[in-house]
A protein has these predicted regions:
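Membrane-anchoring alpha-helices and their flanking helix-loop junctions
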Residues: 1-129, 150-205
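Membrane-interface loop-to-helix entry segments
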Residues: 129-145
């Protein structure tokens, strides 16, 4: 890690967690929910998402700050090409920053309509289509994916890459459930919105 050093990356990750946590607590919707019957993939995705944010990323951040990361991560890739290292780190840092912005603005836009992924809209909920939601329909998932992938590029870790892939698979499964729920709850309004805003990657997908 040459661009900002291991301690710099660790501090960046702690700032990311602080911003995301602050935005989440500013959101007035319910967070804890009863597990919906027959939706095991929903519970798995929510637990995995929580583990990434409150376990994996903090542990990686602390190990980077105290200089233990490369000792603890046996899947670290020892890349010997300087320009490739700098390129991966630059792209990774950009993804971390962009992903954090998506999560923060996503929480702030949702506020009291927020629910964990895979839960059907409540009767008092309205469809949020403004702010970051005008660009992408799932900024919270997209943001966490972006942060995780960015971290994998910065630390060059097969373990973190595997986390990103597993999380992506879970997210895609849960998004199919969510989209059906939103389509039933908001009918034509959601179908029209889904034609304007991308699913996960602004302007692309």
């Amino acid at each position: 890690m040459h661009l900002i050093g291991e301690q710099g990356v660790g501090i960046l990750l702690l700032v990311v967690l602080a911003l995301q946590g602050g935005a989440m607590f500013a959101c007035t919707g319910r967070f804890l929910q009863i597990k919906p019957e027959g939706q095991n993939i929903v519970m798995m995705e929510n637990c995995f998402n929580t583990a990434i944010l409150i376990l994996f990323i903090p542990l990686i951040a602390v190990s980077l700050i105290i200089g233990w990361y490369q000792i603890l991560d046996l899947t670290h890739l020892a890349i010997a090409i300087p320009w490739l290292i700098y390129g991966l780190e630059a792209i990774g840092i950009a993804l971390i920053i962009c992903g954090t912005a998506m999560v923060v603005f996503g929480f702030l836009a949702l506020r009291n309509t927020f629910q964990p992924g895979g839960f059907a809209p409540r009767s008092q909920d309205s469809l949020v289509t403004w702010g970051i939601y005008s660009l992408v329909r799932n900024p919270l998932n997209a943001g966490v994916l972006s942060v995780t992938l960015g971290l994998a590029l910065v630390v060059q870790s097969l373990f973190v890459i595997a986390l990103s892939i597993i999380y992506l698979i879970m997210v895609l499964r849960v998004l199919s459930i969510e989209e059906n729920q939103l389509s039933e709850a908001f009918a034509e309004e959601y179908r029209s919105y889904s034609q304007k805003a991308k699913r996960l990657v602004p302007f692309i997908y």
